[in-house]
Amino acid sequence: MKLKTLMLLTLASSIAMADTASSSSSDAHARALFYGLMAVAAGVSIGLGALGAGVGAGSAIRGAEEGMARNPNMAGKLQTIMFIGLAFIETFALYAMLFSIIFVFTGIFSGKAGF
């Protein structure tokens, strides 16, 4: 409960700071709000991607360790399969980071990208 409250207060304060930092013209205000919310969205997407990858990696390692404990002769094969699976799991976090970087730095939603 405290984490949810802290997250909501952080989001509200970042929006309020973006609101007060903009100039008096409505175009500058809209631009500041847009880029502020884009930064928040990028951070949330990276966080959720890392959360999913962490949960998946933990589950994969737990399963491999249980298999190695049950049958120590299969430890080498299980370890190889686990490392391949971990490589695939980590791609989710990397894709989340890649999409966030693309959205923030290319201006794809602001019309600057030429699409």
From Swiss-Prot:
Residues carrying the site annotation Reversibly protonated during proton transport: E90
Keyword Plastid among UniProt keywords: no
Membrane topology per record: Multi-pass membrane protein
Coiled-coil blocks: none
An example Gene Ontology CC term for this record: proton-transporting ATP synthase complex
Transmembrane segments: 32-52, 83-103
Domain of life: Bacteria
The entry's keywords: ATP synthesis, Cell inner membrane, Cell membrane, CF(0), Hydrogen ion transport, Ion transport, Lipid-binding, Membrane, Transmembrane, Transmembrane helix, Transport
Cellular localisation: Cell inner membrane
GO molecular function: lipid binding; proton-transporting ATP synthase activity, rotational mechanism
PROSITE patterns: ATPASE_C
Function: F(1)F(0) ATP synthase produces ATP from ADP in the presence of a proton or sodium gradient. F-type ATPases consist of two structural domains, F(1) containing the extramembraneous catalytic core and F(0) containing the membrane proton channel, linked together by a central stalk and a peripheral stalk. During catalysis, ATP synthesis in the catalytic domain of F(1) is coupled via a rotary mechanism of the central stalk subunits to proton translocation. Key component of the F(0) channel; it plays a direct role in translocation across the membrane. A homomeric c-ring of between 10-14 subunits forms the central stalk rotor element with the F(1) delta and epsilon subunits.
Family according to the record: Belongs to the ATPase C chain family.
Binding partners and assembly: F-type ATPases have 2 components, F(1) - the catalytic core - and F(0) - the membrane proton channel. F(1) has five subunits: alpha(3), beta(3), gamma(1), delta(1), epsilon(1). F(0) has three main subunits: a(1), b(2) and c(10-14). The alpha and beta chains form an alternating ring which encloses part of the gamma chain. F(1) is attached to F(0) by a central stalk formed by the gamma and epsilon chains, while a peripheral stalk is formed by the delta and b chains.
Protein name according to UniProt: ATP synthase subunit c
Species of provenance: Hydrogenobaculum sp. (strain Y04AAS1)
